Amino acid sequence: ESFGLKQGHKTILQPTRIVRRKGIENAIDLVENLKDPHYKLLISHKAGDEGCEYAEWIKNYALKHGVDLRLAQKFISSPWLHQRHHLNGHSLWNVYAHADFVTFPSLYEGFGNAFLEAMYFKKPLLVNRYANFVNDIEPKGFDLVVMDGFLTPKTVARVRSILESSQQRQQMVEHNYRIAAKYYSFAVLRRMLNSLFTNFFGIDTT
């Protein structure tokens, strides 16, 4: 309710800062092409340290294309900060929990925290094929909606199909969760770190 969302609305979450390399105009184009006024685009973060010019352009772009855009940065506090009270009781994790679909159409990323967050919260995901995704993530076999630099009617149709089919959506996110747990869990990280310490220092940390 803090974001003006009501029962029956469907939340498309863009869980990133509003900076040019995030390709947020693609998320706007997606919502526009879904052609359903119940779909609302929610951006979780503020513009950050790259200025507000792109953020203003994004707001105008959404308005021009008839997309209901909600900006949540005033209502969300970081889940990593140990605050006595979250602002209005919301953290980024609350927003993920209530999202129906996640967009991550970045032009380039180091890795992409939002990708793993979507897997953890079992949310279907649209992702652009940025270089590190192609090299490091795509070969793992995730079931994703993938765009290659631009949206196509086929991409939009698949998103619509996923949003309208709870069975398809559940199969997709459960599959992705298993793959993410196999390759990116804390248990995997511990094994990798232990191997590094053993190889370099002869120390077994298990």
Q: Which residues fall in each region the model found?
A:
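Nucleotide-activated donor-binding/catalytic signature segment of Leloir-type glycosyltransferases, i.e.
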Residues: 52-94
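Conserved donor-binding/catalytic core segment of Leloir-type glycosyltransferases
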Residues: 5-22, 28-31, 41-43
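Short glycine/serine-rich donor-binding loops of glycosyltransferases
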Residues: 112-115, 133
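Aromatic "clamp/platform" in nucleotide-sugar-dependent glycosyltransferases that forms part
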Residues: 107
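A charged, aromatic-enriched C-terminal amphipathic alpha-helix characteristic of glycosyltransferases
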Residues: 164-198
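A short alpha->beta transition loop at the rim of the catalytic pocket in nucleotide-sugar-dependent
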Residues: 100, 122
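Short hydrophobic beta-strand element within catalytic cores of glycosyltransferases
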Residues: 104, 124-128, 137, 144-145
